[in-house]
A protein has these predicted regions:
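Alpha-helix N-cap/helix-initiation sites
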Residues: 27-28, 45, 62
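Iron-sulfur (Fe-S) cluster-binding segments and ferredoxin-like electron-carrier domains
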Residues: 8-10, 50-64, 88-91
Length: 94
């Protein structure tokens, strides 16, 4: 990113540190599948591309990537439902 090279360099360094640390209790495949799920939930096209490719390189198959996407969709839907219930509770109290 031309406008903020320092920030971009820091972000990429953080990415490398977290995703490539060897003393982590999570292996690369697990990290990438978690990242795929989060990327789907945050709706970041760049992140989806990077982490699906990373998951594939770490050994993920299509079913694992699909499961990560579906789990994140489920959790996201659950959060939306909970906020809907909150809206209805507030409506009852108003």
């Amino acid at each position: 990113m031309k406008a903020a090279p320092s920030a971009m360099k820091s972000l990429m360094g953080f990415h490398q540190t977290v995703m490539n640390e060897t003393d982590s209790s999570l292996d690369s495949l697990t990290k990438e599948l978690i990242a795929v799920g989060i990327a789907v939930t945050t709706q970041c096209p760049y992140c989806i591309e990077v982490h699906v490719k990373g998951a594939r390189e770490a050994g993920a198959d299509e079913a694992q990537v699909a499961a990560a996407a579906m789990i994140s969709s489920l959790v996201n839907a659950g959060g939306s439902m909970a906020h809907g219930w909150m809206a209805m509770k507030i409506m009852d109290e108003a």
